[in-house]
Structure formats: structure tokens, C-alpha cells
């Protein structure tokens, strides 16, 4: 276990301040936009963890009433955070909601559901869902208590997804007002979600004197390892950034 270094660090900082008293740049508070962007991202991270937990909880419940129904749909989440499989199980919350219907009746009902929620209808998908429901073995009965458990889990997940979508939109709006936004968005692999997150974590990039300072701030620099004639170039990253 490493010894505590709080006092030693405080002395180091004090000595550094005394040595560079005349050359240290004046502290400038963070801009309101950057501060809000950073806090939005912090909340986004927290809600993302909650969403993962709630999604796992819902899938666990569905394994007892309609196993693997979430794997029948592969549509990407919408801009408002809604997902097709979540909307589907909100209506067809038990495998018997599908298996007790003839294929023709279920197809008609599924078509009506797709039109209501704005999803594409596929007869092959209707047949696949119906076949899956016919082969499912549910552990929990089809009653009001089971329906309450599933729909409450869905309601919590939808609320969290909506909050994430709102935060993402606000982060995008805040990031777009900053001067470095066009440069960040032109980077390879950076999209509408990652771009604002990078800007939130880095802050004002103009405060770094070089690209090496930015790399060290991110904690992905490889510190030197030299002693006498030894000079190791292959090093792991420090992970000691902000």
C-alpha cells in the first residue's frame, strides 16, 4: 500500500508557487458554457449507468414471461431514446399475449401497433415473433401482478431514456456554441455523442501549451523510464490525468 502523500504534495505545490510566483498565469474561472457542458456530461454518465441497470432488470423480468423477446428486434434507439423492443413488450408483455392469438390475428394486431408507433411492418417479423411466442415457456403467470411488474420496469426505463436523450440534445446545443466545435466534429470517429463529451472533459484547449500537455492531462502519456544506461521506450500509459 502506498503511503499517503497529501502533506508532501501540499509542500511541493507551495514551493512551486513560490518559485514561479512572478511567471504563473492568472487564474481565469471557467466559462459558464463549459461549466454547464461538463455538468451535463456528468449527469449523462450517471443516467447511462442507471439505464444499463434498468435495462438488465427488464430483460431479467422478460426472461420469466417472454424469454429472448428483446433479441427479436435490432432497431437502433430513436432520437427521443425509445427502442422498438421496449415499446413492443409494453403492449405484448407476456408470451401468451401473442401465442394465444392465431397468426393472422396477431399479424393484423402487430400491423396496427407498428402504424401507431411509427415502425415498419414486416410479415416475416410477425411470423418470427409468433413462432417464438409459441415455443416459449413462461415461469410467471399471465395476471395483473405480472403485468404491473413488467410495465413498471418499462416505465422507469423509458423515463431514464428520455432524460438521456434530453441531456444529449442539450450537450449538443452547448457544444455547438463553442469555437472548437467544428474542428472536434471533423475528427475521424467523432460523432454527435462523442464530440460534446470530449469537449466537456478537455475544457478550453487553448490553455495547453502543446499537444503533449493535452495528452498528459488525459492521462494517456507514457512517462519516461531512464536510469544510467537503461532507456526503456515501451511503457504503459500513466493513467494519472484529470
Segments predicted by a language model, with ranges:
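A detector of single, family-specific signature residues
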Residues: 1-242
Amino acid at each position: 500500500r502506498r503511503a499517503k502523500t497529501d502533506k508532501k504534495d501540499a509542500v511541493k505545490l507551495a514551493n512551486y508557487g513560490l518559485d514561479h510566483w512572478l511567471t504563473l498565469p492568472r487564474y481565469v474561472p471557467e466559462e459558464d458554457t463549459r461549466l454547464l457542458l461538463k455538468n451535463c456530461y456528468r449527469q449523462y454518465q450517471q443516467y447511462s449507468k442507471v439505464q444499463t441497470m434498468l435495462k438488465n432488470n427488464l430483460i431479467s423480468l422478460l426472461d420469466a414471461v417472454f424469454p429472448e423477446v428483446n433479441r427479436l428486434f435490432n432497431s437502433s434507439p430513436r432520437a427521443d431514446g425509445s427502442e422498438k423492443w421496449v415499446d413492443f413488450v409494453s403492449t405484448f408483455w407476456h408470451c401468451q399475449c401473442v401465442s394465444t392469438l392465431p397468426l393472422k390475428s396477431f399479424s393484423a394486431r402487430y400491423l396496427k401497433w407498428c402504424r401507431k408507433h411509427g415502425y415498419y411492418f414486416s410479415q416475416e417479423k410477425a411470423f418470427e415473433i409468433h413462432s417464438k411466442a409459441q415455443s416459449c415457456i413462461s415461469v410467471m403467470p399471465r395476471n395483473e401482478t405480472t403485468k404491473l411488474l413488467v410495465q413498471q420496469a418499462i416505465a422507469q426505463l423509458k423515463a431514464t431514456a428520455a432524460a438521456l436523450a434530453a441531456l444529449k440534445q442539450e450537450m449538443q446545443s452547448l457544444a455547438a456554441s463553442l469555437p472548437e466545435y467544428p474542428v472536434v466534429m471533423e475528427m475521424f470517429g467523432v460523432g454527435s455523442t462523442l464530440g460534446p463529451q470530449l469537449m466537456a472533459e478537455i475544457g478550453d484547449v487553448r490553455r495547453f501549451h502543446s499537444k503533449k500537455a493535452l495528452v498528459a492531462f488525459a492521462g494517456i502519456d507514457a512517462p519516461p523510464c531512464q536510469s544510467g544506461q537503461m532507456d526503456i521506450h515501451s511503457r504503459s500509459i500513466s493513467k494519472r490525468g484529470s
